[in-house]
């Protein structure tokens, strides 16, 4: 089956690790018109592109970014096309093609579990879409590895929709620290990369000083620096939304309906089933897991972090205008170089909740 470089609609779903992107991505994936690519920028890192591109990239960089994005959109490995849970029934794919594709995914995953990972890691998983059916496809690409490239990527894909998720600083830091303790991350904390952008420099962060900070404070600064860049990018885009993790967790059905509509999609029975099953889960939790008790997860950090740890995190967060997204937090003493999200329904809007 011949596959075009670009489908009818593209949605870029970005956020920091542990910010709620996976649940939102699988929410979209449950929709029968969505084709989902899970973190293809981990398969192809794009090291030839700048980590901290200019907020207004030039034409040459946009062209190079577009070539890279075309590669990501076409990446169909087990990681990018077979993330769990697998939603097989799609409007753009025949029933037979759906069954064959699901069987292939389960078979490749079984081979990976018995040690054949190096052989199967790059094995392509077919999309199973006839050329005539691509016009009904909405392709959703999720990334937690490229928050500083969000603006570059969105500009390189004119007409795309952007959704950026952001989590309360204490919730983000608590979850990241838990992951560090569990050894859940493939890569070590990269101080040099984090401090290379203008955002870190604006806050006066220097490598020698930063490395002496406790991990809790390093993670808090990571929340500030990366989210500041992404929110600055969102403010410059014509079709972008910011979503607070807690708002979506507290009202998943309303939030899903609004975000799907933003992407030109409706709330379907399959998606409603996913919302119900994934938010009312009462079993044992794992670090990387879509099915959770949403109500219990929202404020989990209040029990994981001591009052003193919460105060240290918030002292750093309050140095950023990001706290404008949480009115209950004290107004910051020091600003950064972007305006709070407007409330007029345009770029940078807080799509759900306050």
Locate predicted features.
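PAPS-dependent sulfotransferases, especially Golgi type II membrane carbohydrate sulfotransferases
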Residues: 1-12, 17, 181, 186, ...
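Conserved nucleotide-binding/hydrolysis micro-motifs of P-loop NTPases
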Residues: 42, 169-171, 249
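Short beta-strand segments
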Residues: 13-15, 38, 140-142, 164, ...
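Acidic-histidine catalytic/liganding microenvironments
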Residues: 31, 157, 237
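PAPS-dependent sulfation machinery
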Residues: 39-141, 186-210
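A conserved segment at the C-terminal end of the G1
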Residues: 22-34
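Conserved phosphate-donor/acceptor-positioning beta-strand/loop module used by diverse small-molecule
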Residues: 142-143, 156-177
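A short acidic, amphipathic alpha-helical/loop segment
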Residues: 23, 151-156
